[in-house]
From Swiss-Prot:
Residue ranges that the Swiss-Prot or TrEMBL entry lists as coiled coil: 109-145
More details: Trehalose, a disaccharide essential for several organisms to survive drying, is detected at low levels or not at all in some tardigrade species, indicating that tardigrades possess potentially novel mechanisms for surviving desiccation involving tardigrade-specific intrinsically disordered proteins (TDPs).
Biased composition (Basic and acidic residues): 219-229
Subcellular location: Cytoplasm
Protein name per UniProt: Cytosolic-abundant heat soluble protein 107838
Organism placement in taxonomy: Eukaryota, Metazoa, Ecdysozoa, Tardigrada, Eutardigrada
Length: 229
């Protein structure tokens, strides 16, 4: 194998590997506050930090062209001179074009990703606003229902208290009627007994008189007879 052929093989195996560049997605925080009847929404875009992919061959050109390859060449052609990687303008230009194309594709993917994230975030925010508005309206309805419920309870309590007072007064009146009847019955059955004695003394004569009065209600007696019958 000639030296020119070996140089061609070495140039074909040589690969230009551009220095790896780490790409970080800046954290983008989007905050929108829209207040409609105490409705507040806050959007935070999740932080995504993905390292740029790095591709490399199993062996670099210098490893392929190092001492190990030199030993095999020396056995074939008995050439002991050291070999090194050679920079070829055509391959370097191709590598630069590939790197530029890779950068453009990555930037396009990143831009599309950001647009998709913003679109989904905006859709989610609008959905959350709709749900929050529904919840707010339902809570307002619940508040009105609570107010009506409390009014009903208070009115029921007042009405019940009035009924309790009416019952109490009605039975108190019955108790008073019974007491009046008892007093009247006691007066009707009561017997009046009086002893009367009069003594008159004068210079001419002395006079003494006496009497007894017993009084009993005839009305009570007749009522007792009716009750017994």
């Amino acid at each position: 194998m000639s030296a020119e052929a070996m140089n061609m093989n070495m140039n074909q195996d040589a690969v230009f590997i551009p220095p790896p560049e780490g790409e970080q997605y800046e954290r983008k925080e989007k905050q929108e506050i829209q207040q409609t009847s105490y409705l507040q929404s806050q959007v935070k875009v999740p932080l995504v930090n993905l390292p740029a992919p790095f591709f490399s061959t199993s062996f670099s050109a210098q490893e392929i062209l190092g001492e190990g390859f030199q030993a095999s060449i020396s056995r074939i052609s008995a050439v002991s001179e050291e070999l090194s990687s050679i920079e070829i303008p055509e391959l370097a230009e191709e590598a630069r074009r590939d790197f530029a194309a890779k950068t453009r594709e990555q930037e396009m993917l990143s831009a599309n990703y950001q647009k998709e994230v913003e679109r989904k975030t905006e859709a989610y925010r609008k959905q959350q606003e709709v749900e929050a508005d529904k919840i707010r309206k339902e809570l307002e309805k619940q508040h009105l229902r609570d107010v009506e419920f409390r009014k009903d309870i208070v009115e029921m309590a007042i009405e019940n208290q009035k009924k309790m007072i009416d019952v109490e007064s009605r039975y108190a009146k019955k108790d008073m009627d019974r007491e009046r009847v008892k007093v009247r019955m006691m007066l009707e059955q009561q017997k009046f007994h009086s002893d009367i004695q009069v003594n008159l003394d004068s210079s001419a004569a002395g006079t003494e008189t006496g009497g007894q009065v017993v009084s009993e209600s005839q009305k009570f007696t007749e009522r007792n007879r009716q009750i017994k019958q």
